[in-house]
């Protein structure tokens, strides 16, 4: 069953990789756009990464590794999909940086203990059959004092769950968004843990895509669209983000966000 799940994930992402045009990827937007609050949260806590050895788990098209390489990190980009690793290497070449690329299973990493200064993962854990195993592996390969930085979707918001059901063609059958209580496990594993959640009122943008702009969720990935069109969306997003800040101060509201971002120190 586990191998079958991983193989389905590999096939899905290989097919996606075959359709990616690296020339259209604006790397910095995935970290610096106002509509990338998860990565902005992570960047604030990463510190100076120049010369640091960074493992990018589930590297996808390589936006993360390329961005960090541009900041001076030595990046190892890994993905279970060989197609995605190849795209990441192409993106690095197109941006004039060097990264190492490897196919890897995040639940069984082929790296020694205490290897990396930083482990980064975006939208990975909800594709993993057992996220806790992947978290243990992140912890294992980090040097003492190293940081695991990652973000993923949560399962609790009814609006985003409707979107997930509609966008079946651009999602895998085995995806399992996280329960916010996984934070308790992360806190038990790492010496320090900081986290926040993002996108509550700001999810109005998804509703606008569907109800007003008539964007087919099976033809355009909304979570890519918010980055690609960040300049157009910025005025609306920034107004709604202020409301998110108010909502998250209310009891239990953080769990109804779309995404959670975590920085955990070994």
Q: Where are the regions a protein language model picked out?
A:
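A conserved beta-strand element that flanks and buttresses the S-adenosyl-L-methionine
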Residues: 120
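A C-terminal cap/extension of S-adenosyl-L-methionine-dependent methyltransferases
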Residues: 163, 197-266
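A short glycine-rich, Lys/Arg-flanked "PGG" loop and its adjoining helix->strand segment in the class I
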Residues: 132-144
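Class I SAM-dependent methyltransferase SAM/SAH-binding core
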Residues: 55, 61-108
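Conserved class I S-adenosyl-L-methionine
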Residues: 1-49, 63, 67, 149-171
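Short alpha-helix
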Residues: 175-195
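Short catalytic micro-motifs in class I SAM-dependent methyltransferases
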Residues: 123-127
